[in-house]
A protein has these predicted regions:
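Multi-pass membrane proteins that catalyze or facilitate reactions on polyprenyl-/lipid-phosphate substrates
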Residues: 1-285
């Protein structure tokens, strides 16, 4: 058996939607393949396909925020030069691009540490449907708390502290568990930290870039001959993830400005509870 083009497109759509909407892409990429009976030609193809899906969403966020990324790169180079000029702190206070650059650096550290130290331990949970269901419930709770207790504030980049970035980064590190939404946890942390709603989402998406890129790089070594099997399906999934991912970013940025994220909390609770119930019925708990 081999993954079909239709199955690949479905999984690409799922990845594109759930990577940026706060409902956990890892959970859906565990559950959906079982629902549509995906069979890979070999383990290498599974790794190759997963890597391409993540590269698709990586390109989506880069394409959407390319102007911000250019400013961030310029800010990084300029702030490094500021160190030698003795103007590093002044630059962080006066230049939003420099400040955002280092807020992203600080926010990335916890996930990088968690990935190095805990990835193998959490890898086994991707085959544990009960764990996926439980962590989906937790994602729903995070979204509910962030909306009910705070719902965001009025902090802009210039007011955002490195402590805020570290806290958001720690929440992102929790997303190493399947079912904990990376975007959901970071947006929730941003709202609880008092960030403007749109900034919380924007910072979350920019913070995704090094994390998605890092995860893809880690998987590259395990691809092997995976790219040689049914290349058409792999490309179809990649393109679906890219296109839908781009549209999902646009959708969430619009939603977070105009509406509550509670609908995603309810969704996570429903899917999480259903997963736990089915796991219990089939003796998987």
């Amino acid at each position: 058996m081999d993954i079909t083009i239709i199955q690949a497109i479905i999984l690409g759509i799922v990845q594109g939607l759930t990577e940026f909407l706060p409902v956990s892409s890892s959970a859906h990429l565990v559950l959906v393949p079982q629902l549509i009976n995906v069979n890979y030609a070999n383990p290498s193809q599974a790794v190759a396909f997963d890597t391409l899906l993540h590269l698709g969403t990586l390109l989506a966020v880069i394409a959407y925020f390319w102007k911000d990324i250019i400013h961030i790169i310029k800010g990084l180079i300029s702030s490094i030069l500021d160190i030698f000029r003795g103007k590093f702190i002044t630059g962080l206070k006066e230049d939003p691009s420099k400040r955002l650059t280092w807020l992203l650096v600080i926010g990335t550290i916890p996930a990088a540490v968690a990935g190095v130290l805990l990835n193998d331990q959490f890898e086994a949970l991707f085959n544990n449907y009960a764990a996926v269901g439980f962590f989906l419930l937790i994602t729903g709770v995070l979204l509910w708390i962030s909306e009910r207790m705070k719902g965001g504030g009025d902090k802009k980049i210039k007011n955002m502290t490195f402590k805020n970035a570290l806290v958001i980064g720690i929440f992102q590190a929790f997303a190493i568990a399947p079912g904990i939404s990376r975007s959901g946890s970071t947006i929730a942390a941003g709202l609880l930290s008092g960030l403007e709603r749109e900034l919380a989402a924007r910072y979350s998406f920019l913070l995704a870039i090094p994390v998605i890129a890092g995860a893809a790089l880690v998987q590259v070594k395990d691809i092997g001959t995976g790219l040689e099997a049914n290349t058409a399906a792999l490309v179809a999934g990649f393109l679906a993830a890219l296109i839908v991912g781009f549209l999902s970013i646009k959708l969430l940025l619009k939603l977070i400005k105009e509406r509550s994220l509670m609908i995603f909390a309810y969704y996570c609770w429903i899917i999480g509870a259903a997963t736990l119930i089915v796991s219990y019925m089939y003796g998987l708990i």
